[in-house]
């Protein structure tokens, strides 16, 4: 597990300007960055290693006024705003904790703790040696020197993904967020 500070200033400004969910936008950008790093697309089936075309996000979502979250899973697609709209629609329409049919693909698990400034997070569970599902979590963003940052935790199976790959993910995520400074 690796945790690092992620500057999200441009993302927060972008989501505010475009009336988008910061959370859904962060899920989308992390998913896009992960899918750009081939090592994150490795999966193990029946003892054999494969590279999948993409991983889809599967993320916790807490409906307004509720203390019972649900798991939302859907393809990220190619458009940030479209993903945010689709995620919101799916969350409103989904009445069960988890849609088992949507969980059948190659996934990335996401969680967010917006109530605390995250310094590290380890997901519970007994992950087997062939578990290749990346787990991404982040906490509340805080302001320092006019910039918003948050602690972002990346939990992976070290048999398949190394620090080099986490660095590649972080660089791609940074680039995607910085690119929003010049958009909408």
Positions of predicted regions on the chain:
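Short amphipathic C-terminal alpha-helix that caps PH/PH-like domains
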Residues: 30, 84-91, 169-177
